[in-house]
Amino acid sequence: FLSLIPHAINAVSAIAKHS
């Protein structure tokens, strides 16, 4: 589960970069 946290952060970071 902990491995999923960094993955979610990476997704949010990508979305923020796209915005």
UniProtKB/Swiss-Prot annotation:
Belongs to the frog skin active peptide (FSAP) family. Phylloseptin subfamily. It comes from the Eukaryota. Keywords: Amidation, Amphibian defense peptide, Antimicrobial, Secreted. GO terms for biological process: defense response. The modification Serine amide is found at S19. This is Phylloseptin-O2. GO terms for cellular component: extracellular region. The keyword Transmembrane helix does not apply. Expressed by the skin glands. Has antiprotozoal activity against T.cruzi. It is found in: Secreted.
